[in-house]
Structures are given as C-alpha cells and as structure tokens.
Amino acid sequence: GRAFLGIGPGDSAVYNLGLRGARLEQMREYIVAVRELFTRHEAQYQGRTARLTWPQRRVPVYMSAEGPRSLRLAGQVCDGVVIGLGLTPELVRDAIEYVRQGAREAGRNPDEIDKWWLVKTNVSDDPRQALEESRMALAASANHAFRFTLEGKRVPPELADRVERLKREYVYAEHEKLGAERKNARLVDELGLKEYLAERFALIGTADQCVARVRRMAEAGATSLLLTAIGPDKPRLIKSLSDRVLPHFR
C-alpha cells in the first residue's frame, strides 16, 4: 500500500501542555521499537515487551528532521525523512549528506532512504500579499527548525540573535493561525526576518518564480516535496499549483 508512519518529537500539541518534545535518543528508541513491531511483531520498549501480530506487511517509518544530528538519525534508523532544514541549494545538499552519513554509519544503503522536503507554499500573482499571508507559517518553520540549536544549520551570524528571540517569544497557542494581528506573524516583521525565512523555508511568489525555485532545488538533489498550502484561500492555491506549477515537473 501507500501508507507510511510519520514520527516527530512533538510540536505545538506537546508544548501547549507545558511538556517538552522528545529528545533524539528517545526518538531512536521509539522508532527502532516501532520498526521491530512491523518486522518481528515484537519489540522491547522502555523495559517492556510490546507485540503487534496483525500487520500483513511492513509499514515504512519516516521521521521529521531539521539539523545534522536528527538527519543522521533518520539515515540510521528510518525508511524516510521529512526535511525541515531549508530549501536553498546549499541546505538541500547539506541535508542529503547528513542523511547519507547516518546511513553509512549504520551500514545501510544511503540511496534507499526516501527524502522529502517540507515546503510552505503560496503561489500568487501578488507575491507581496502572498508573503504577508505566510508570515505565521514562516515563524512556525523557524521555531521548529531552530528550537534546540542553531549549530550546523547555516544561520547567518548577524541574524542569530533575532532568531533566538523568535524562539523565546513564539506563541504556541497561536501556532500557524492566520491573521495579521497574530503574535507570531508580527514577530517575523518586528525582527526583520520575513525575507530570510521566506527564502529559506517557503515557495512563495508567482507561478514562474515557484517553478524556478523548484528547479534550483532539483538541481541540488531534491527529488520529493511535501507542499503545505498557506493562506486563506486554499482551493485557489491548490488549483494554481495544479494548473501552473506541477505541469512543469510531470
């Protein structure tokens, strides 16, 4: 079948409860146990035996990953990875290499790890308006990608303090909520990060601009994009993607 299981450390749903996302070693333990359940129908997890006897086939396990350590972990233990490090050519190449490093460290074939890039998307004939509509999503991507550390993530030194402030002031209760008045959207403007975050995490602009951006990613090695529609009119956006962007890549 086409089903796969995606696992992440926990984002707004966890932090809104006052909890903390899972650490990498917790992720490793959990993912290894889940994969063993699908292959051996039995696994040890946190000192207990778990059994899952009904699966007819192994479901691929993917994880979300943003930095060098999590991307290497994905290469070590996962079938695939959803990459949130960024979309620029150098970041695409970095992510691929980190995943390949992890696979080699685990004695796996690096070419067998499926790689998808998470892309916040708003295709519009009015790029300025599209960018305004997408600010809260840019804040969310930055907060998630940089939450634990900026190390190894190519954040320009002159922007590091501003990124750290975004992390400190990010409002999880307004996670990815639309509206110019939302705190997270305003933060992006107040900190002067809008253009940088759009270039790093998003596909925003006219259809021609988006096509050119995807081609640059493909030239750097990206093969699969997970597009998330950002904006108040999602049916219009989906139609724009279908009619004006995707035909260039079929």
Where on the chain are the PLM-derived regions?
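Glycine-rich phosphate-binding active-site loops on the catalytic face of alpha/beta enzymes
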Residues: I7-P9, I83-L91, S141-E151, A229-I230
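Well-ordered beta-strand positions
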Residues: E36, D79-G80
